[in-house]
Design a protein with these regions (language model features):
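Flexible mid-to-C-terminal extensions adjoining Fe-S/redox cofactors in radical SAM and related proteins
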Residues: 2-27, 286-360
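Conserved alpha-helical substructure of the radical SAM core
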Residues: 2-133
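Residues immediately within or flanking Cys/His clusters that coordinate Zn2+
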Residues: 32, 36, 40, 263, ...
Length: 360
């Protein structure tokens, strides 16, 4: 699959026009709060290199609430999802208080969890705290999942979490799988496992060379393996038994429109902002701290959102190196911002060129 058809090209043009609109208007839709850097696992692929105890303390809820009050003063909070992420959010003892405070201000509240602490009792607490969105990590069958997570109990905990979240009323939830060379051959088994467990939404990620994953290149997919992942997603979408998609990770050329419900554009700084555990304000949390735009302890969050983020909203500066003469730059705009190192260079071959490298 190497050539885009006329319909795809028209949709890419439409997406390009929409991106230009977002650059001008930048309506905030997703606000990620790194509520802790502590974690109860030590996963091989962790992009944040999280530990059981962190040198950076959890941000007090009282420090984050003024950010929400600022946002609510300038836009409709019911249209903004506040995602509590980590680390592992459930290691934070006041997480339910955080969730209630978010909901009391009219925002939607979501969370990404490894599931280790999520049982039926915790699910009831989450429901009472008003959670609206949740993602659970399942990274393979038992052997592959436990290997990636460095834990002998994490697979059973994740499956228990899947059972528990189905008791939460009106919850939007999905399963996230980080695909690597070990679990790629078992994607069909994983698919059947998830369907049998009641999962209807499934997002697949490939692993990027960040955090601990930067030290273990075996976690990264080869060009051919990456193509196989995308082909699996296309086939599974056609089957219609589970709603599967590839993550918002990068521009995919001829696979655009086939593996996601939308055409790629990096939303960091356009509709997505983040507050790190130390107060830094950025686009998405996967982006290096070099690109932080301010800090809530010295800056107004809303002023930063409205008047900074130039690097995010005008990405012509990314048009160098392999992007300089690339025919896809108009549409990919330098690919996912998180793939840039501190010098602005790509940390890996972009997905578009990965797919082009394959000899058909």
């Amino acid at each position: 699959m190497s050539v885009m058809n006329a319909h795809q090209r028209q949709q890419l043009e439409n997406t390009h026009d929409y991106m230009e609109h977002l650059k001008r208007e930048h309506p905030l839709r997703d606000l990620f709060w790194e509520c802790t850097l502590r974690c109860n696992m030590s996963c091989r692929h962790c992009g944040s290199d999280c530990l059981k105890e962190s040198r950076v303390p959890d941000m007090p809820l009282a420090d984050f609430l003024p950010v929400l009050d600022e946002v609510a003063a300038h836009c409709d909070p019911s249209q903004v999802m506040v995602e509590t992420v980590g680390g592992e959010p459930l290691v934070r003892p006041d997480l339910m208080d955080c969730g209630r405070a978010i909901r009391e201000r009219g925002f939607m509240w979501g969370m990404v969890t490894n599931g280790l602490k999520l049982d039926h009792a915790v699910a009831r607490e989450l429901a009472q705290a008003g959670i609206t969105s949740l993602s659970i990590d399942v990274d393979g069958m038992r052997e592959e999942h436990n290997w990636l997570r460095n834990s002998t109990t994490s697979f059973d905990a994740a499956m228990r979490a899947i059972e528990a979240v189905q008791t939460i009323p009106d919850l939007t939830w999905d399963v996230i799988t980080c695909v690597n060379g070990r679990n790629l051959p078992r994607l069909n088994e994983i698919k059947n496992l998830l369907i049998e467990a009641g999962v209807t939404q499934w997002r697949c990620f490939s692993i990027d060379p960040m955090g601990r994953a930067a030290l273990d290149k075996s976690l990264l997919l080869t060009d051919e393996q990456f193509r196989d992942l995308l082909n699996f997603i296309v086939t599974t979408r056609c089957e219609g038994k589970i709603d599967i998609s590839y993550a918002c990770d990068g521009f995919l050329g001829a696979y655009e429109g086939l593996v996601r419900d939308y055409f790629f554009y990096c939303q960091a700084g356009l509709t997505v902002a983040s507050v790190r555990a130390n107060g830094d304000i950025s686009g998405c949390l996967s982006i290096r701290s070099d690109y932080s735009q301010g800090n809530i302890y010295r800056d107004s969050f809303w002023d930063v959102w409205e008047n900074r983020f130039e690097q995010f909203r005008d990405r012509e500066w990314m048009r160098h190196g392999p992007c300089k003469d690339c025919e896809a730059f108009r549409y990919c705009q330098g690919d996912g911002f998180h793939l840039r190192d501190g010098n602005g260079d790509l940390m890996m071959t972009c997905h578009y060129k990965q797919l082009k490298n394959i000899k058909l």
